[in-house]
């Protein structure tokens, strides 16, 4: 799956425009389209907009929590930003996210400068699980996540 992200994110970053295109791209890259993927896309698009970055213009440092069910958020962020392991712009940290966070992602401009720290709280997981359980359609999942507030926190990265 990670190899697919490396290959596809280089060529298709930010080319998806509709919920249908995002869901199709996410499913093709990740192998499915649960609610974690569109949350990653939402974070990636938010960071790209706030940091005024184009495709492949950001670096990501991803802190996973082994208590979270998966690190699928990383695939969504990679899809939205064009970051990849192969380009050395996506790194999964050896250290873990704190216990109260499913993931922490530090996103910075590739050329340097101030970045952003995104935290996905463990408290968001039941909401994401409910979206997956209640909505079988990937496009409906995408739209539900994009409309939802409070699924992540964002602050300036130190």
What is the meaning of each model-derived region?
Residues 1-10:
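Bacterial N-terminal signal peptides
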Residues 16-33, 42-158:
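Non-transmembrane, aqueous-exposed alpha-helical and coiled segments at domain scale
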